[in-house]
């Protein structure tokens, strides 16, 4: 469950290390984002010579949340930290590698590139 001002780790090699959610996309009254939702983020911490710089405002997709995600078969999955992948204007990842596991729910939301780059899909 991601809302405005939530800090997230970045799960790709775009150059950003930490980002902060500044908007949840999907309607003016929408308060929370979960796995597979697109948010607008501000880069708070970045590595030198990365593709994104500190202060950049970008779109990102949430790939891991500390709040559990319920599935139709009754199981739930949760992670230790919140994480996101930075996207370009075509909703494709900026980075060429994904770090850590991602959830199956991304497949239903057509983030196939992230699914294929991820080392593990839970």
Swiss-Prot record:
<dbReference type="GO" id="GO:0006412">
    <property type="term" value="P:translation"/>
</dbReference>
<comment type="function">
    <text>Binds to 23S rRNA. Forms part of two intersubunit bridges in the 70S ribosome.</text>
</comment>
<keyword id="KW-0687">Ribonucleoprotein</keyword>
<dbReference type="InterPro" id="IPR000218">
    <property type="entry name" value="Ribosomal_uL14"/>
</dbReference>
<dbReference type="Pfam" id="PF00238">
    <property type="entry name" value="Ribosomal_L14"/>
</dbReference>
<dbReference type="GO" id="GO:0003735">
    <property type="term" value="F:structural constituent of ribosome"/>
</dbReference>
<dbReference type="GO" id="GO:0070180">
    <property type="term" value="F:large ribosomal subunit rRNA binding"/>
</dbReference>
<keyword id="KW-0699">rRNA-binding</keyword>
<dbReference type="InterPro" id="IPR019972">
    <property type="entry name" value="Ribosomal_uL14_CS"/>
</dbReference>
<comment type="subunit">
    <text>Part of the 50S ribosomal subunit. Forms a cluster with proteins L3 and L19. In the 70S ribosome, L14 and L19 interact and together make contacts with the 16S rRNA in bridges B5 and B8.</text>
</comment>
<keyword id="KW-0689">Ribosomal protein</keyword>
<protein>
    <recommendedName>
        <fullName>Large ribosomal subunit protein uL14</fullName>
    </recommendedName>
</protein>
<keyword id="KW-0694">RNA-binding</keyword>
<dbReference type="InterPro" id="IPR005745">
    <property type="entry name" value="Ribosomal_uL14_bac-type"/>
</dbReference>
<dbReference type="InterPro" id="IPR036853">
    <property type="entry name" value="Ribosomal_uL14_sf"/>
</dbReference>
<comment type="similarity">
    <text>Belongs to the universal ribosomal protein uL14 family.</text>
</comment>
<dbReference type="GO" id="GO:0022625">
    <property type="term" value="C:cytosolic large ribosomal subunit"/>
</dbReference>
């Amino acid at each position: 469950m991601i809302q405005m001002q939530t800090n997230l780790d970045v799960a790709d090699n775009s150059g950003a290390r930490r980002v902060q959610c500044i908007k949840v996309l999907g309607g003016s009254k929408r308060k929370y984002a979960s796995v597979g939702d697109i948010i607008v983020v501000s880069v708070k911490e970045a590595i030198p010579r990365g593709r994104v710089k500190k202060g950049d405002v970008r779109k990102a997709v949430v790939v891991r949340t500390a709040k559990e995600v319920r599935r139709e078969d009754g199981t739930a999955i949760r992670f230790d930290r919140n994480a996101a992948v930075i996207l370009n204007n075509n909703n494709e990842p900026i980075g060429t590698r994904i770090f850590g596991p991602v959830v199956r729910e991304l497949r239903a939301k057509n983030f196939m590139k992230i699914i294929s780059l991820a080392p593990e899909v839970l």
